[in-house]
């Protein structure tokens, strides 16, 4: 986690059997365990469930799950040990890796969430063009790009040696430690040191800490690029998705007098999107507000508040598989099968695409469906054509022609799988 203060988190006199330490251990262990199990289940569900494995959206869900899984295994575990012991146990080299992996996994997780929102919007906005637009190659290129960007903002600063301190800077740090006036160095955008924290009596064995001080300018740039811009795009995508869902729902309801159970689909979509955006903001916004403040003066924010914001960000990796998994009926079925250790019963559908769309509309009142849909092709004389091609018509009391694209969009939205399909 990018943070401007870790050197005075705990000292060598920490009581390892205090209620506070026990609480930290229990809560941290639960977050790590749920993160690992949940994200492993997501990956297994996608690769073992035929319906999920054939979807282009799987790449983005797997990217999110892998980022959260790596964050739990490589970052949270060692962060918890560091918090419990009060000092760094794993050496200077791994400290570099740990800090960089922290930034990379968090950035990749946020970017993946943003890409998922864009992908889902495209699915509903242009369902007929989606398969042609979102090819496997394009999906993999998007995933590769977001991971490369995440790597750049995390590891490159170390490779450029922005973190190295001169001997004069090291002497200044130790002088400040002795005088209890530790200040953040402004000489570099980054400053890293594996320092020796003195105990209360100043004579005890020094305890190393893994530190990562952040300059204010970098903190602002990182927060803007890796959180505020992706967050704005995600909110924009989900707002447009909600408006499309509302528009299509009202149109189909007015034309076909939907079954009463379909009357709740709009509220289900709104509830799902509210949970997604609300959870994301609740977990990440506090840290990205406090982090620039910490870079200016590490004493402005109480230590306890700062640590809470760090673990709130970690907690997002715990709830992601719950939200993005259980909001989809296919994932729920796959989770139940995996938890019960049941085998997959794969079936091959022989139903044509148009017939599948028609069958998906079985919730329309039967009396309005006098027969199967017919295709009206562009012969240059059809007054209902829009840009050529064919449209699928469903006989209704009002004889309204509904395009196949609109039908497919409503099929997606009617299943309440607003996030992933």
From Swiss-Prot:
Could you give one GO CC term from the UniProt record?
Answer: plasma membrane
Q: Where is the protein situated, by its record's location annotation?
A: Cell membrane
Main localisation = membrane
Note the topology in the membrane.
Answer: Multi-pass membrane protein
Topology Cytoplasmic: residue spans: 43-59, 119-138, 235-274, 326-421
SMART domains attached to this UniProt entry: 7TM_GPCR_Srsx
Q: Which GO terms describe its molecular function?
A: G protein-coupled receptor activity
**Which Pfam family is an annotated match for this chain, by its short name?**
7tm_1
Instruction: Tell me the keywords, alphabetical order.
Output: Cell membrane, Disulfide bond, G-protein coupled receptor, Glycoprotein, Membrane, Receptor, Transducer, Transmembrane, Transmembrane helix
List membrane-spanning regions: 22-42, 60-79, 96-118, 139-160, 214-234, 275-295, 305-325
Does the keyword section mention Disulfide bond?
yes
Biological role stated in the UniProt entry? This is one of the several different receptors for 5-hydroxytryptamine (serotonin). 5-HT plays important roles in various behavioral and physiological processes in aplysia. These include feeding, locomotion, circadian rhythm, learning and memory, synaptic plasticity, and synaptic growth. This receptor is mediated by G proteins that stimulate phospholipase C.
What protein does this entry describe? Answer: 5-hydroxytryptamine receptor 2
| Organism the protein comes from | Aplysia californica
């Amino acid at each position: 986690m990018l943070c401007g203060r870790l050197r005075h988190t705990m000292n060598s006199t920490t009581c390892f059997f205090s209620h506070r330490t026990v609480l930290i251990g229990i809560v941290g262990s639960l977050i790590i365990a749920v993160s690992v199990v949940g994200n492993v289940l997501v990956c297994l569900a996608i690769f073992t469930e035929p319906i999920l494995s054939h979807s282009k959206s799987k790449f983005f869900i797997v990217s999110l799950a892998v980022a959260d899984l790596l964050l739990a295994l490589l970052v949270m575990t060692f962060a918890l040990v560091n918090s419990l012991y009060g000092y760094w146990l794993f050496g200077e080299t791994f400290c570099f890796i740990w800090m960089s992996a922290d930034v990379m996994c968090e950035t990749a997780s946020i970017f993946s969430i943003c890409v998922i929102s864009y992908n889902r919007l495209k699915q509903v906005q242009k369902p007929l063009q989606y398969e042609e637009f979102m090819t496997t190659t394009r999906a993999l290129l998007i995933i590769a790009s977001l991971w490369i960007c995440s790597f750049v903002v995390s590891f490159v600063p170390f490779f450029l040696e922005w973190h190295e301190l001169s001997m004069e800077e090291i002497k200044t740090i130790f002088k400040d430690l002795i005088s209890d006036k530790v200040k953040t160095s402004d000489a570099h955008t980054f400053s890293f040191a594996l320092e020796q924290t003195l105990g209360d009596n100043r004579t005890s064995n020094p305890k190393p800490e893994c530190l990562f001080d952040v300059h204010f300018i970098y903190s602002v740039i990182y927060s803007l690029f890796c959180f505020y811009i992706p967050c704005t795009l995600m909110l924009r995508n989900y707002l447009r998705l909600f408006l499309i869902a509302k528009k299509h729902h009202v149109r189909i309801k007015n034309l076909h007098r939907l079954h009463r159970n379909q009357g709740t689909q709009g509220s289900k979509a709104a509830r799902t999107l509210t949970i997604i955006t609300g959870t994301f903001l609740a977990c990440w916004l506090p840290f990205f507000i406090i982090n620039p403040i910490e870079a200016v003066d590490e004493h402005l924010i109480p230590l306890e508040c700062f640590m809470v914001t760090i673990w709130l960000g970690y907690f997002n990796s715990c709830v992601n598989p719950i939200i993005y998994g259980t909001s989809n009926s296919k994932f729920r079925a796959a989770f139940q099968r995996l938890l019960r250790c049941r085998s997959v019963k794969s079936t091959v559908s022989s139903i044509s695409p148009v017939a599948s769309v028609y069958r998906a509309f079985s919730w329309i009142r039967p009396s309005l469906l006098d027969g199967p849909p017919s295709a009206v092709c562009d012969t240059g004389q059809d007054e209902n054509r829009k840009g050529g091609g064919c449209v699928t018509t469903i006989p209704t009391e009002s004889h309204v022609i509904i395009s196949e694209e609109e039908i497919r969009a409503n099929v997606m939205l009617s299943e309440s799988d607003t996030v992933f399909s």
